[in-house]
Amino acid sequence: MNDRADALLSNFSDRVAARHEGETEYLQAVTEIARDVLTIEKANSAYTKARILERLTEADRIISFSVIWEDDAGQVQINRGWRVQHSNLLGPYKGGLRWVRDLSPSVLKFLAFEQAFKNALTGMPLGAAKGGADFDPSGRSDAEIRRFATAFMTQLAAHIGPDTDVPAGDIGVGSQEIGVMARVWMQHARRWGGVLTGKPVALGGSAMRAEATGYGLLYFTAAMLDAEGETLKGKRIALSGRGNVSRFAARKAIEQGACVVTMSGRKGTWHAPDGFSPQALDWLVAAEGDSAYSPPKALELTFEEGTRPWGVPCDIALPCATQNEIGLEDAKTLADAGCRYLAEGANMPVTQDAIAHLARAGVLQAPGKAANAGGVAVSGLEMQQNAGFSRWSAAQVDGCLREIMCTIHDRLTSERRSCCTQTGAVDYRRAANVAAYRRLAEAMIAAG
């Protein structure tokens, strides 16, 4: 950045930080966007006059509520719930619900802000929101989770609707919980409606929802490689996590002829030197408890306790586990081991210093707001199916998903002129921020 850009960023960051003191995750996300788009805003008099980016940093509203429910022992439990309705410039508020013990409004604000840019990139009529509760479903019985879900939706129901705010699942909230909450909303509203996405198919959910983020990640990665004259075939992929995103990304990678060499969990890494076979992947997905740490020898898979998935030589890194999982040392390891591409399956999984090091090393990096947009894309397709009282086949949904992810890639490459690396390749991180910002800015100007 030049001195003028540095000054713009410093002044802007100071103003935002004064209003959001101590909200580390949120300020990190805002700073990343601001670094890329402030000079564009200042070069456009209409954008400058409307103070587009500063307005985009403020959520429309934050809804806070208590969730009172009873556990199996008959004891009253009290949790807190939130819904950050960030922006409905482009369509109904849209974003997931997560139930995590230490959830905070700061994390939800960061996720909702990121969601606004991710949803804008899809080209679909989707606003942005995020919500959840400081509830940990692990160790809770099915009955307790149902009672909590019922109490949570009873409080949230008045604030959402098919044309207002359409939540989805996220960490701790799967299709079963979405199904319970959808039914509670219908009873509250006294009508049927596609008010939540990620529903069980029997309740109006879409085919391919579970696969969407992982498959979409591979479709975007394949488009990146194609732009460089390469394919996935034979590429070594280091993957983190073993949840839905990871397992379906691994499945699609194997299907495309790539060699998935790692997956990971809290205690360490599963390493397949010659690549996961479909059988090894199925075994790992199904394995429960401590049995997962002792793979059968026939699978040619080992578990390495206390290790991270980034120490294995690879061509492509796909971080799919959690925020800030790749730090500077991990980035150095990846670059030194020959990694040339990175695409984010998780939200903000790479720290700023790691991003900078990978960029200096010439690693092409696709941010989560573009690369993991498959989940929200299929959520949007579920909304279309619900609104039209129709149901699409898995093949139809998959075809639409592939098209959306390739269109997102094309949208980013169209920003090449102002968003390129020193070698002339597309700077995907900056291009994603710029392309999404332009769509949101034009909508804000049009709205007056």
PLM regions and their residue ranges:
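Adenosine-phosphate binding glycine-rich loop
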Residues: 2-29, 224, 335-448
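Conserved active-site and cofactor/substrate-binding residues in soluble primary-metabolism enzymes
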Residues: 3, 7, 24-28, 32, ...
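Structured beta-strand/loop patches that form or line metal/cofactor-binding pockets in enzymes
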Residues: 46-75
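Phosphate-interaction motifs
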Residues: 65-130, 134
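Glycine/serine-rich phosphate-binding loop and adjoining beta1-alpha1 elements at the start
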Residues: 100, 119-233
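Glycine-rich phosphate/diphosphate-binding loop of Rossmann-like nucleotide-binding domains
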Residues: 197, 204-313
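Rossmann-like adenosine-cofactor binding region
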Residues: 268-365, 370
